[in-house]
């Protein structure tokens, strides 16, 4: 049985929730069959929005930070899942090279790295940290908020060019916790004898949100048929616009007209189900991450009325990458609250196992806004006691 998260949404069960609960045995079997055909991501985190009438993933991170925000009670589950995941790729693994993001001054992110090292060390692996940054030329100590140290070491290629590791450390598996927004690292390309997880093409230099949601659209149709619900209740509508330049206004007409089309589709669904909320669209950089390059739009005219500050925010994202492609996503309200502040659940998986989650809470935001923004904090999600593993 998959552990059940405890939700902050109180009140009577919505029709969607009833259907999911009633179909639990069929859902478990469906997942079992799907995992036999498809390889799950090595690990991921999924942002969910729960509007009661609709429960949908709105973002999936294949290089998840934030493991430090999970409840420590879930650590044994993470270790168990990590063991199973590593055994798939390298049953004889002894050494694991973990490659974190480059922003080593972010204390919260470093705590995530510490937790990941803890998880994989408890599987029995030797774990060390590597970097492809040209600034890391020797073992470099990185101070943690609690006064302890991490050591970051330069990645080197083996003499035959077929493996990568550290000077005196030959890993079976290389685990990326770096989303490669700035481009693919040449030092990890064309490795023939090691598993690089997730694969390089999962990084933002290649991956696009619009491709992800096109694939999810197919999955949602199958799943909706299985539990007898409209797939729309599990899946946000989306569209895509390319050749955008927020600074010189090029592509603006295309963006505004596509926002109009999407809003009309959402209004039609809201009318069908008697939903009184006001529809909105979230415009995101198609290769965006860290909550950057995101804006909420309730009317197409807002696209043409962006001020300089808003344009600057949309034009450039992580690692200075310029935005030229955007995904337009149906906005999903969140009706969940923690201590009267708006909240959304973020669920973490290793391989096919749910290993925990937390509420992203933001007192400065409303139910129709992006919560991954300044002012947010995290509250670990508990699992329902009777389902914990």
Q: What are these model-predicted stretches?
A:
Residues 86-103, 374-389:
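Conserved catalytic alpha/beta cores of large enzymes that bind or transform nucleotide phosphates
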Residues 80-81, 104-277:
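Conserved N-proximal alpha/beta basic substrate-recognition cap immediately N-terminal to
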Residues 54, 257-280, 286-383:
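Phosphate-binding site of ATP-dependent enzymes
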Residues 39-42, 120, 167, 339-342:
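Short solvent-exposed loop/turn micro-motifs enriched in small/polar/acidic residues
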Residues 95-98, 174, 281:
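Conserved hydrophobic helix-helix packing surfaces used for dimerization/oligomerization
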Residues 1-28, 38, 44-45, 51-56, ...:
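Low-complexity, highly charged intrinsically disordered N-terminal segments
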Residues 26-36, 324-332:
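Short Pro/Gly-enriched beta-strand edge/turn motifs at strand-loop
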């Amino acid at each position: 049985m998959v552990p059940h998260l405890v939700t902050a949404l109180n009140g009577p069960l919505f029709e969607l929730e009833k259907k999911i609960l009633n179909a639990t045995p069929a859902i478990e079997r469906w997942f079992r069959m799907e995992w036999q055909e498809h390889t799950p991501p090595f690990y991921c985190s999924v942002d969910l929005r729960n509007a009661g009438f609709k429960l949908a993933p709105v973002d999936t991170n294949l290089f998840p930070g934030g493991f430090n925000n999970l409840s420590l009670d879930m650590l044994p589950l993470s270790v168990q899942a990590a063991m199973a995941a590593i055994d798939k790729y390298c049953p004889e693994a002894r050494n694991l090279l973990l490659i974190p993001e480059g922003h080593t001054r972010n204390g919260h992110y470093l705590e995530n790295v510490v937790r990941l090292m803890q998880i994989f060390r408890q599987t029995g692996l030797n774990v060390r940290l590597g970097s492809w940054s040209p600034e890391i030329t020797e073992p470099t100590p990185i101070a943690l908020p609690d006064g302890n140290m991490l050591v970051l070491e330069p990645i080197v290629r083996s003499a035959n060019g077929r493996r990568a590791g550290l000077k005196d450390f030959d890993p079976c598996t290389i685990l990326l916790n770096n989303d490669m927004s700035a481009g693919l690292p040449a030092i990890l390309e064309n490795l023939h004898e090691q598993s690089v997880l997730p694969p390089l093409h999962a990084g933002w230099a290649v991956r696009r949100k619009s491709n992800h949601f096109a694939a999810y659209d197919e999955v949602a149709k199958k799943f909706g048929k299985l539990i007898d619900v409209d797939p729309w209740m599990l899946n946000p509508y989306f569209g895509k616009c390319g050749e955008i330049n927020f600074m010189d206004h090029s592509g603006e007409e295309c963006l505004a007209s596509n926002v109009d089309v999407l809003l009309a589709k959402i209004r039609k669904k809201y009318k069908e189900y008697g939903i009184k909320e006001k529809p909105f669209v979230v415009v995101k950089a198609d290769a965006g991450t860290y909550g950057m390059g995101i804006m909420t739009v309730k009317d197409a005219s807002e696209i043409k009325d962006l001020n300089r500050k808003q344009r600057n925010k949309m034009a450039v994202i992580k690692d200075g990458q310029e935005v030229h492609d955007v995904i337009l996503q149906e906005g999903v309200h969140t009706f969940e609250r923690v201590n009267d502040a708006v909240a959304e659940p973020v669920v973490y998986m290793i391989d096919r196992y749910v290993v925990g989650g937390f509420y992203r809470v933001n007192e400065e935001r409303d139910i129709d806004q992006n919560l991954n923004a300044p002012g947010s904090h995290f509250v670990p999600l508990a699992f329902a006691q009777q389902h914990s593993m």
